[in-house]
Every structure is written in C-alpha cells, then in structure tokens.
From Swiss-Prot:
The keyword Hydrolase applies. Belongs to the MtfA family. GO terms for molecular function: aminopeptidase activity; metallopeptidase activity; zinc ion binding. Zn(2+) binds at residues 111, 148, 152, 211. Its cofactor is Zn(2+). The keyword Zinc applies. Involved in the modulation of the activity of the glucose-phosphotransferase system (glucose-PTS). Interacts with the transcriptional repressor Mlc, preventing its interaction with DNA and leading to the modulation of expression of genes regulated by Mlc, including ptsG, which encodes the PTS system glucose-specific EIICB component. Shows zinc-dependent metallopeptidase activity. SUPFAM superfamilies: Metalloproteases ('zincins'), catalytic domain. Binds 1 zinc ion per subunit. Gene3D superfamilies: Collagenase (Catalytic Domain), Glucose-regulated metallo-peptidase M90, N-terminal domain. This is Mlc titration factor A. Its main location: cytoplasm.
Amino acid sequence: MIKWPWKAQEITQNEDWPWNDALAIPLLVNLTAQEQARLIALAERFLQQKRLVALQGFELDSLKSARIALIFCLPILELGIEWLDGFHEVLIYPAPFVVDDEWEDDIGLVHSQRVVQSGQSWQQGPIILNWLDIQDSFDASGFNLIIHEVAHKLDMRNGDRASGIPFIPLRDVAGWEHDLHAAMNNIQDEIDLVGESAASIDAYAATDPAECFAVLSEYFFSAPELFAPRFPALWQRFCQFYRQDPSQRLRVNAAEGDYGEESEH
C-alpha cells in the first residue's frame, strides 16, 4: 500500500481560475467555443467536488489545478459530471512513485515487489497521478495519464473491476468485446513485427482489455488520427460511448485553418 506523506498541500477553493490560460494547450485547441464553455463549467464543478492534494513537496497553483480539472472533464464532456462520482481526492506526486505490488500467479502463489507507477485508480478510492506525466498530457501525442485513469474509473462503473467494457447497452457488449480484442491482436501483431518501442500505438494496450480501453481512450482524445483509420469499427463505438468525435473536430479545425490561409492571399 502507498505510504502517505505527513505533509501534503491541498488546493483551496478559488473563484478566479485562469481558464483562458488553462485552455491554451494542444489537447484542447480543437474544441469549439461552446465546448470550451461547457468544459469550463464542468471543471468548476469538478474543483468544487474533488480535493487536489499535492504530495512530497509538489506545489499546486491555480493554473495547474485548472488544467488538471479540464483534462479530467474532457472525457465526460457529453456524459455529465456524475460519471466522475465514486472518488473525492486526486493525489499528485511530483514524479512517478513507488508502490508495493502484490499478485497471484497461475498456481496460487502470491508475489510481492516494489514497482514504479505513473498513476493508479480504484473503484472506491482516489486517483493518484504524477506531475511529470501530467505535463506530458497537455500535447496531442497519444499519451495522456489523466484520461487513462479517468477511463479506468468509467470502466469500473460497469462492475467491481475494470474489464475494458464500460457502461454501455447490453446489446452492444458482444460487438464491443469483439472489436476491442481485434484491436489488441492487431497491436500485438505490430509489436511482434517491429518491437514495442517502434509500435505506433502504446504496447500497453495489448496487455489487457481494461488497459486497451484506457490506452485507446488516450488516443481517442489526443491522437484521433492514429486511432480512427486503423480501428474504424471500434472508433465508432468509442464515439457512441463518449458522445464525441475528436476526429471530426480535427477535420473542422484543419479546414478552417486552410480557409484562413486562402483568405489571406
């Protein structure tokens, strides 16, 4: 279990969050003005309902807190803040942290070792993050620690543990499971061919259905151009679940940029 530090900094309520500055990251650039306004409203409620707790000397400020809240709320922009029920604290280390991990092997032996983690989430516990990886979540690279952990929370709303199948209509479960496993197999095939470091999708997605859902949720929001054309059927299922289409946002933003360039000639 994690040993909580004796001293921690907790963010206090602040009515003057720097939302304009907080929105100025590549991850959020394709949102419309209306979507940005709704995301801010959700983020304000998030900061009212959750405690952000800085650990081991890390210091939170208004800008950091606002950006964290915006990214937390991006996956539930069309779902509603109630989808983030079930936890009250976000614990933030300055860097990846060490935990004591236990697991049971195929013959029932329990093993224990200390491992380095970037983040953790439990069904009825806090979400644990680290600032170094949060900073790397601001861009549009396919990596996003916050979205990864939020996806696990959304996944766990469908049962006691993350399974890779979020809370969707029962009629859609078999198709979702089929398409998710097909994606895992495809990712594993690429890993076998080129190696983990050269794979175009994070190799962690091939390890487990729950991790595949969480990793592909990262790509869904931050690198749709790598997800949508490769797994079109699963992409549509993600669009239906999240009720968003980041690929469409990307196309609209690109078209508006092209139009602006033509108008200048």
